[in-house]
Amino acid sequence: IYTSDHGEDIFDDPRHLFLHASPVPSYYQLHIPFLIWMSDSYRETYPEHWEAVTANKEKNISSSSSFFPTMLDLGGIKTPYRDDSQSVTAPHYVLKPRVYLNDHNEPRPLDDLGMKKQDFQMLEKRNIKY
């Protein structure tokens, strides 16, 4: 699995924003990679994980919500903290609304952040639900 904790602005649009941690995040700060690769031998040994990740690949996955549950699922680790409904390698993955964790550790819905019109246009262009 490859992911990141945040996206980054690198002069991507006419606003010329740079880096991250703006008071109001941009699309580029919110767009976070989440890649899963499985070797042929892993796919053969754990076909249920491959089938689930293939079935979930077009879903609007939130990497921050899914990373930990997916790692526990892939590792076969049993714990009361494991939530397979948020594991993209589980057959019953459930989409949750996207949120942004602000500087006060409070989850906020994306449409309540004061983002600019062009940020919502980019989310829609990439088919990212919010």
Residue spans for each PLM region:
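Catalytic domains that recognize anionic headgroups
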Residues: 1-130
